[in-house]
Amino acid sequence: MTDVPVSHIRNFSIIAHIDHGKSTLADRLLQLTGTVDPREMKEQFLDNMELERERGITIKLQAARMTYTSRDGETYILNLIDTPGHVDFSYEVSRSLAACEGALLVVDASQGVEAQTLANVYLALEHNLEIIPVLNKIDLPGAEPDRVKAEIEEIIGLDCSQAVLASAKEGIGIEEILESIVHLVPPPRDTVDQPLRALIFDSYYDAYRGVIVYFRVMDGIVRRGDRIRLMASGKEYEIDELGVLAPNQKPVESLHAGEVGYLAAAIKAVGDARVGDTITLAHNPAKEPLPGYTEAKPMVFCGLFPTDADQFEDLREALEKLKLNDASLHYEPETSSAMGFGFRCGFLGLLHMEIIQERLEREYNLDLIITAPSVVYRVTTVKGEVLMIDNPSLLPEPQYREKIEEPYVQLEMITPETYVGTLMELAQSRRGIFKDMRYLTQGRTTLVYEMPLAEIVTDFFDEMKSRSRGYASMEYHLIGYRANDLVKLDILINNDPVDSLAAIVHRDKAYHVGRALVSKLKDLIPRHQFKIPIQAAIGSRVIASESIPALRKDVLAKCYGGDVTRKRKLLEKQKAGKKRMKAIGRVDVPQEAFMAVLRLKNE
């Protein structure tokens, strides 16, 4: 396998917005190069997680090695490193781009450039990749290749004279794409004689072999049986198995600079082989690790609690297993007076949170309660200490804090002109600060806003899609923290604060949110045998309250006529019982109530 000269290797990835046909295009490339046996071929071959196929999105990274004989008669090795297209996974995208020399920019010829495409293109340009524009879905009646070419040239500034017109579904233009990869993407640098440096761009956990690491050799050569060191963690391992991904694993003896492959070395947890880390040899280590390794920081936090307290250990195990595959998932145990024991989890964004939650419920059969997502606030205390708070119930009391700062993002929305008004209204209602508006070709507009992340985190994306009938797309990145007049809104049920319902909101919105919350909870919490007051409070001031009336048993059913004092005695007895119950009774808050809080924040 290693007799292929470096000049005949091409490493590329595919950049695209969700649903622009990236996975289908990857399928066609695998088919045309004969990489996958026609009998094994299925739609979206590389998306092999059930959830990915169902949602039609790529979540985990995949890689495949293809052999292609070009029209010039030479045989080339093409390594495709598939990238996820969603904004939450941009750290995965940046790693896989670092392992490539070129990228196919796939744009839907009927829709044009979308916000997410832009975000990934800028990442690719930062890594100095050769970008080949591909206009996909040209078989659609609504395709306008010339308009889209002009749009790519105008927005991204790429020369589109070389753009390939293709239809992955119909198999049109696939060979042209392969030819342009061979001729336009530069080969890797020939650095076989240097000390080994390889970039880890993905890893997953295999129950039998431990962690399987996907990597790209940047310098040097790696052989089976070598003792390797991971530069960020400093740990050492011996390689048991080394191979290439074609796309199924195929063992080989050695891999040299420029090649992409996998290794197994009895590594116990994915946390030991962090994505973006550098592999080097233990006896002849490289001086410097490869640049660009950062740990993905969670942006969104929420509490996960099992509905059945006995499942706590199962939940811990499930999270540990997911953590093996997903180094960006953070979790730590927490207790809540209303929900018992559970975990505080950190995610990259909302989609990431939904996927983890769905996988826990699906693959591990857990029944979960999820609290409202919150972002990380920066609180400066009176003493001048700076605290990072990811859980509203941990916020210090007002007299101890100097200021609260919240994360702000720059948000870019690309939308047809018709929906500009309604989207601007949406952004303003979410405390957005208008920054810029640019007109693109053919009646499309870019809107740029600065906005608190907390306002995007719940349902901004859904709201934007429904207001623009699905045509708008968005992309955001963090720009820093800013101080705001934020307060902690407590919800008291039966005079007890429920920590998992607490939220940090802007003072101007507090009354409105509190009012809406208590009335929603009134509808959702079932009636008990005693009266339940529900209150929303800021500090000690109650700003809204509702109460759920008690259920009453008809204690007078068996009194026909007779003395009124007899009836009064029974009613008094019932009243005393209710009073006692109220003092010691627990209110069961159903999962719907917590979910309502999620949805309500911005209604």
Curated annotation (Swiss-Prot):
An annotated Gene Ontology molecular function: GTPase activity
Pfam families linked: EFG_C (PF00679), GTP_EFTU (PF00009), GTP_EFTU_D2 (PF03144), LepA_C (PF06421)
UniProt xrefs under SUPFAM superfamilies: EF-G C-terminal domain-like, P-loop containing nucleoside triphosphate hydrolases
Keyword vocabulary terms for this entry: Cell inner membrane, Cell membrane, GTP-binding, Hydrolase, Membrane, Nucleotide-binding, Protein biosynthesis
UniProt catalytic activity: GTP + H2O = GDP + phosphate + H(+)
tr-type G domain sequence ranges: 7-189
Annotated coiled-coil segments of the chain: none
PROSITE patterns: G_TR_1, G_TR_2
Binding locations of GTP: 19-24, 136-139
GO biological process terms on file: positive regulation of translation; translation
InterPro entries (UniProt xref): EF-4 (IPR006297), EFG_III/V (IPR035647), EFG_V-like (IPR000640), EFTu-like_2 (IPR004161), G_TR_CS (IPR031157), GUFP (IPR027518), LepA_C_sf (IPR038363), LepA_CTD (IPR013842)
Membrane topology (UniProt): Peripheral membrane protein
Compartments, record wording: Cell inner membrane
Cellular component aspect of the GO annotation: plasma membrane
Record's keyword annotation contains Protein biosynthesis: yes
Superkingdom of source: Bacteria
EC number assigned by the record: 3.6.5.n1
Family classification: Belongs to the TRAFAC class translation factor GTPase superfamily. Classic translation factor GTPase family. LepA subfamily.
Physiological role: Required for accurate and efficient protein synthesis under certain stress conditions. May act as a fidelity factor of the translation reaction, by catalyzing a one-codon backward translocation of tRNAs on improperly translocated ribosomes. Back-translocation proceeds from a post-translocation (POST) complex to a pre-translocation (PRE) complex, thus giving elongation factor G a second chance to translocate the tRNAs correctly. Binds to ribosomes in a GTP-dependent manner.
Listed name of the protein: Elongation factor 4
Gene that encodes the chain: lepA
